[in-house]
Amino acid sequence: APRPFVDKAGIFSGAKERIFQSSPDMFETMSSPLNDDLSEVIVSRESATMVPNQWRINLETAAETQITFNQDRHPEITSARRERFTINRADGFESRVTVTLPTGYSDGTRLPAMFWFYPREYSEQEAYDEGFQTFNKNRFPNVGARSMSILTLLGYALVEPDVPIVGPEGQRNDEYPHDLRNTLAATIDEIVARGWVDRSRLGIGGHSYGAFGTANAMVQTPFFKAGIAGDGNYNRSLTPAGFQSERRYLWEAQDLYIEMSPFFQADRLSGSLLMYHGMDDHNVGTHPIHSDRLFHALEVLGKTASMYKYPFEDHGPATYETTLDLWARWV
């Protein structure tokens, strides 16, 4: 695992001296120096099984004093079994998947699964692989108010696949539908082959560009029974000057914009789609009208869909009341 460090460098000589480095079995970062020569510092320390806490450390004497005493409030989730592995798509591209299985899971038990993802664009395999130089297995699996790992308490497997969209500069999204389908298909085949998941009981979800990907997955594939899409964009013609890593204007790549827009493929939606949107979403690409229009289209087409809009929420639920309501709808 990568080991964060701090070096002291001579301005004129360029000579370096390492004054701090994380332990190999921990994830430690320097939070703050306490004096000019960095002989005393505050360090954040955590591991895969130890919740993050802050320590005051004298780097000269190695004396340590713990100054925060955070506790793991969700041991039944953080102790869940996590598997991280590589899959091979039909086109030969290799990508990574993380699967979280409920605490106490018995091998061979096929579970319903929830996919949660966010597509990202890359120029090639090497560019994708470079992003994993910073992955650290010693990070503690924190649980937030909207962490989908909470679903493991209900007996679901959580599947978090990387979904690389690959193409050269200026043509990044030309293979978007194919890359999306191929990655999801390869992921499903692998987790089914490992005996973890029931292929007939799959859901999918995501937030923002992940919501866009979710709606696309449900119109481009027959794999999923249900989807959750939050604060998404579903009609790329409403972002005509580009989006994500797409730099072509709508008028240069009109067919691509339409092909990538779930709104224009809404008649092909399989499964049930739940959408949620903050009514004060100020993100330039995800105006609430996107959810309004897609919901109306699905309603006209007789598809099973629901939409929940939350007042005073921006691009991502923040309030206690909204979070509780979302979980009530999701489960």
Predicted segments, located by residue:
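Flexible loop residues that form catalytic
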Residues: E46, L59, P119-R120, H207, ...
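Surface-exposed, flexible loop/turn segments at secondary-structure boundaries
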Residues: P24, T49, A62, D72-P75, ...
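Short, well-ordered beta-strand core segments
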Residues: V41, M114, G227-A229
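Short beta-strand element of the alpha/beta-hydrolase
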Residues: G108-E121
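Active-site donor-binding loop signature of nucleotide-sugar glycosyltransferases
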Residues: Q21, F69, R89, P119, ...
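Active-site-proximal cap/loop segments of hydrolase catalytic domains
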Residues: E126, E130-V331
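Non-catalytic accessory segments flanking enzyme active sites
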Residues: R3-T109, R146-S149, L153, E190
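Short hydrophobic segments within beta-strands
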Residues: T100, W116-F117, G205, Y276
